[in-house]
Design a protein with these regions (language model features):
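Compositionally biased, intrinsically disordered/low-complexity regions enriched for serine, proline
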Residues: 1, 21, 30, 96, ...
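Lectin-like carbohydrate-binding module/patch detector with strong preference for beta-trefoil
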Residues: 552-694
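Bacterial Sec-dependent N-terminal signal peptides
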Residues: 1-10
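Carbohydrate-active catalytic/glycan-binding domains of CAZyme proteins
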Residues: 9-555, 591-595, 634-638
Length: 694
């Protein structure tokens, strides 16, 4: 199969350019987000596990458009071999966990836990650094820190049994003898805590994963309790179901397995949520007084993404969503600063942008901020020279043990990563190429045995190896990874001219797993399989093409289309009886044909081609979705973009969705809370263009 060269340069941003945004904020992994506001600036810190530089910090002015501005450290400053992938020791899925970012006393604080090392704190006067590291030790993880009004500093931590510990003001460690239980086991409270003091009341936002993910708030007039708790969001998956988890057999020598290990991918239950529900994250008050949550959500092999959710205070509780549909949040909503009250008109941002520059020509003196090393690198064994990245080949049995592997997160929903590879510097036993750091891993690359070069595609899940002899007179090839990450699959391809690409190997299934606790990552690597240092490989012009980043045509303005309900696979019909109903599957008649009326800022009205407009009467119950001939009375919906021509229609009156039961035979209603994980409860729709007859 020949594939054309990737062409587009646009990268995913949540900003729709019309005064609205669509979740996720980033279509790549950003785990355990913690949000901080300082004046009119907003900062987001996230987990980086075993990757360095570590403890990433993003900056925003509007909560929608973000920029990567800092890391708290360039490399782990611990000396144990496991931080550097030495002597078969590793920290996959360990390292930096669940940071907490705070600002007090004129400086920034970022707290985190490092497995086996305890509580760590990084401080800086300037958010851009330099950062000072304080090893506070102590068994405190998934913590939140509160600088209270009386000058005391408290850390909230623990799962189920939630504890509070006072910290020393000089960051030397926890204060001895101050730990007390503030919420006892049995109250349904989990971990991933975020503590706030608002109008004299203490609010603790926590997440739980048993039996599935949800977010809970606990509140008290005293930090020591007693606390009352309630769930503030549950079941909000935006139509994503539980992921397939990698299963590693017992008895393997290493946690990450090894070549020959018989991995398995777990069963996918499309009706289950697991941790695809919006869960761990923080809340923040925007400068206009509105409140927002930034919670993470599992997006399968992509990893854990961040979603921005509007909040409503009711009876002293910060609830996700709006009256009439608390606990659920729109996937598309008006940008902060414009969504005053229950609804409003958005204003476009001057410069919508992605947080990272993903493509890299390696011409600069430093790597772009999107790149991270897999564990600590050996800085003597890599370099940027003559516009290329050079990786020296260090001894390793396979990719997951290869030092100096340079990675960046894959980006969804679909993307194509391509890199130029130069192999004239290889020696016997060297392996280099483009890989996927995951458990199990995979890669495509060049292997040198003696003087012969072999193009190899390797998939660890099945332990399949595909080899082909390749001639590279100029020592140059192009490698590519084609990813459909919403559907958890990817395939490799190669080229010898940079124009025509040939696929290699199968379309591989991808998964999430609890070993590295990360989604899939592109990897540039070079290692030697013969137990010695080899030569070197050089990389140039790494590009990421995102075919679905441009969503400007996702709303079918200026088109005539049918509306297909994913639950019934039947088209909606403007029934002559005056109800919105469904018709037989292949009905192409005029009464199944619709057009959109653009109301601005993502708001639309629905018009049947016979001239009637959809209008919701009463409470929006089944049979209340009817019609009017007056365009001024037409219902105004906020279009919810679910990609691939799938969408939902959100009422700006009751904050519920248009839908039809797939089982009862009832007509359409306007009372759906949101989609189910399989998108088959009757609320997720798909538009199909009706072509004009010649």
């Amino acid at each position: 199969m020949l594939l054309p060269m990737a062409a587009t340069a646009q990268s995913w941003t949540a900003d729709n350019g019309n005064g609205t945004f669509t979740n996720p904020l980033f279509y790549d992994e950003f785990s355990d987000p913690d949000i901080l506001r300082v004046g009119d600036d907003y900062y987001l810190a996230g987990t980086t596990m075993h990757a360095v530089p570590g403890l990433v910090i993003l900056h925003s002015k509007d909560l929608v458009n973000w920029e990567n501005i800092s890391y708290c450290f360039d490399r782990f400053d611990f000396t144990e071999d496991r931080f550097s992938l030495k002597n078969h020791e590793e920290i996959y899925g360990q390292g930096v966990w669940a940071p907490c970012i705070r600002y007090a006393n004129g400086q920034f604080y970022v707290y985190t836990n490092v497995n086996g090392k305890g509580l760590q704190c990084y401080t800086a006067k300037d958010i851009h650094g330099p950062w000072e590291h304080h090893n506070m030790k102590g068994n405190i993880y998934d913590l939140s820190v509160l600088f209270d009004d009386d000058g005391k500093i408290y850390a909230i931590h623990g799962y189920g049994e939630v504890k509070c510990t006072e910290l020393e003001p000089d960051m030397s460690g926890p204060k001895e003898g101050t730990t007390r239980t503030i919420i006892h086991e049995g109250n349904g409270v989990g971990e991933g805590h975020h503590m706030y003091k608002i109008d004299g009341m203490y609010y603790l936002i926590s997440t739980d994963y048993r039996p599935n993910g949800r977010t809970r708030c606990s509140r008290s007039k005293s930090i020591w309790g007693p606390y009352e708790t309630r769930v503030i969001t549950a079941d909000e998956t935006y139509g994503y179901h539980a992921a397939s988890l990698t299963q590693v057999p017992r008895g393997v020598k290493y946690r990450i397995g090894e070549d020959g290990t018989k991995f398995a991918l777990g069963h996918v239950d499309k009706d289950a949520t697991a941790c695809t529900n919006a869960h761990q994250g923080g809340i923040v008050q925007f400068k206009d007084g509105t409140w927002w949550a930034l919670l993470m959500q599992d997006f399968h092999s992509i990893g854990r993404t961040v979603c921005l959710m509007p909040m409503t205070w009711t009876d002293g509780w910060p609830m996700i969503g709006f009256k009439g549909n608390y606990g659920r949040a729109p996937r598309t909503w008006f940008n902060p600063g414009t969504a005053l009250g229950y609804y409003g008109l958005g204003e476009p941002v001057d410069n919508p942008h992605a947080p990272y520059v993903r493509s890299e020509n390696f011409d600069a003196k430093q790597l772009g901020r999107v790149w991270q090393w897999n564990h600590n690198p050996d800085d003597k064994q890599w370099s940027l020279r003559s516009g290329k990245l050079r990786l020296n080949s260090l001894p390793a049995e396979q990719l997951m043990w290869a030092r100096n592997t340079l990675t960046q997160r894959v980006i969804g929903p679909t993307s194509v990563a391509t890199v130029e590879l130069y192999v004239k510097g290889l020696k016997d036993g060297d392996v280099c190429g483009l890989g996927n750091i995951n458990v199990p891993c995979s890669w495509i690359g060049i292997v040198k045995n003696g003087k012969a070069l072999t193009l190899r595609c390797f998939e660890q899940l099945t332990n399949d190896t595909i080899d082909t002899t390749i001639e590279l007179p100029k020592g140059k090839s192009w490698l590519r990874c084609i990813g459909d990450y919403d559907n958890d699959q990817a395939q490799y391809a190669y080229s010898t001219d940079g124009v025509n690409f040939q696929t290699m190997g199968r379309m591989m299934p991808l998964s999430y797993q609890l070993i590295s606790f990360q989604g899939s990552r592109h990897a540039l690597f070079a290692f030697n399989t013969k137990g010695k240092q080899g030569g070197y490989a050089e990389f140039d012009n790494f590009t990421v093409d995102e075919p679905m980043a441009d969503r400007s045509k996702n709303i079918p303005f200026d088109k005539t289309f049918r509306i297909i309900n994913l639950a019934t696979n039947r088209p909606a019909v403007c029934d002559p009886h005056g109800l919105l109903y469904d018709s037989r599957p292949n009905d192409q008649g005029r009464l199944t044909q619709f057009q959109l009326v653009d109301r601005g800022t993502g708001q639309v009205s629905l018009k049947c081609v016979d001239g009637r407009y959809v209008k919701v009467y009463g409470e929006g119950l089944a049979g209340d979705v009817r019609f009017t001939t007056d365009p001024k009375e037409a219902e105004v919906f906020l279009w919810q973009d679910y990609l691939n021509q799938e969408f939902m229609l959100l009422s700006l009156k009751n904050h519920r969705y248009l839908g039809k039961s797939p089982t009862t035979g009832s007509p359409y209603s306007m009372d759906y809370a949101g989609p189910d994980p399989a998108r088959r409860n009757g609320s997720v729709l798909k538009w199909e263009e009706v072509k004009a007859e010649n």
